[in-house]
């Protein structure tokens, strides 16, 4: 199954908008560490992994992902690891043509940038309040 990648130039993405859809292989945590094919859907805030038609999807939310590490390129596969905030490593591989690693990395960067922009006004407000003089006639150390 070929992956379908849809990258839009819109600055605001909804969490339901599908950015990429297709097949990805996940290495199992079992003793033999076999590669299992998963149907995957990438949105602006998560990666959904489907094992079968009836089982519910496992979701990796971007707020719990620290980074995506590209481990190895071969002629057939790209091996990469998703590292969670708790430093759990989840190994994946995809065909070179599918570019899943790049799609997930770009979506994660976009998510982190949107989150930083949302937090910026709050940070700026907290910073300006901490720099205000405590008494009306008092000047800050940086003032004239």
From Swiss-Prot:
Gene Ontology molecular function terms on file: phosphatidylinositol phosphate binding
InterPro entries assigned to the protein according to its UniProt record, in alphabetical order: PH-like_dom_sf, PH_domain, PHLA1/2/3
Biological processes per GO annotation: animal organ morphogenesis; placenta development; positive regulation of apoptotic process; regulation of cell migration; regulation of embryonic development; regulation of gene expression; regulation of glycogen metabolic process; regulation of spongiotrophoblast cell proliferation
Phenotype upon gene inactivation: Mice are viable, and show overgrowth of placentas with expansion of the spongiotrophoblast. These larger placentas do not confer a fetal growth advantage.
Domain PH: 18-111
Family annotation (Gene3D superfamilies): Pleckstrin-homology domain (PH domain)/Phosphotyrosine-binding domain (PTB)
Location relative to the cell: Cytoplasm; Membrane
Record annotation: effect of changing residue 27 to L: Impairs the ability to rescue growth in cdc25ts mutant yeasts
Induction: Maternal Phlda2 allele is activated, while paternal Phlda2 is repressed due to genomic imprinting.
Matches recorded under SUPFAM superfamilies: PH domain-like
Membrane as UniProt keyword: yes
Modified residues (Phosphoserine): 140
Domain of life according to the entry: Eukaryota
Membrane-protein topology: Peripheral membrane protein
Cellular component aspect of the GO annotation: cytoplasm; membrane
Record key words, sorted: Cytoplasm, Membrane, Phosphoprotein
Tissue distribution of the protein: Specifically expressed at high levels in extraembryonic tissues in the developing conceptus (at protein level). Expressed in placenta and yolc sac. Expressed at low levels in fetal liver and kidney.
Primary location group: cytoplasm
Keyword Phosphoprotein: yes
Additional note from the record: The Phlda2 locus is imprinted. Loss of imprinting results in overexpression, leading to placental growth retardation phenotypes.
Record comment regarding domains: The PH domain binds phosphoinositides with a broad specificity. It may compete with the PH domain of some other proteins, thereby interfering with their binding to phosphatidylinositol 4,5-bisphosphate (PIP2) and phosphatidylinositol 3,4,5-trisphosphate (PIP3).
Family: Belongs to the PHLDA2 family.
PANTHER family: PLECKSTRIN HOMOLOGY-LIKE DOMAIN FAMILY A MEMBER 2, PLECKSTRIN HOMOLOGY-LIKE DOMAIN, PQ-RICH PROTEIN
Function summary: Plays a role in regulating placenta growth. May act via its PH domain that competes with other PH domain-containing proteins, thereby preventing their binding to membrane lipids.
Protein name, entry field: Pleckstrin homology-like domain family A member 2
The organism of origin for this protein: Mus musculus
Gene symbol of the encoding locus: Phlda2
């Amino acid at each position: 199954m070929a992956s379908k990648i849809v990258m839009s130039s819109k600055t605001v993405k909804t969490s339901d908008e599908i950015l990429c859809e297709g097949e990805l292989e996940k290495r199992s945590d079992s003793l033999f560490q076999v590669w299992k094919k998963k149907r995957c859907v990438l949105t602006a805030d998560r990666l959904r992994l489907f094992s079968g038609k009836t089982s519910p999807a496992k979701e990796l939310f971007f707020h719990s992902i620290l980074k995506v590490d590209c481990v190895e390129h071969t002629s057939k596969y790209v091996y990469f690891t998703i590292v969670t905030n708790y430093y759990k490593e989840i190994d994946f591989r995809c065909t070179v043509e599918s570019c899943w690693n790049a799609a997930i990395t770009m979506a994660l960067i976009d998510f982190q940038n949107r989150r930083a922009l949302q937090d910026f006004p709050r940070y700026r407000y907290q910073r300006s309040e901490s720099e205000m003089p405590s008494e009306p006639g008092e000047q800050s150390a940086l003032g004239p």
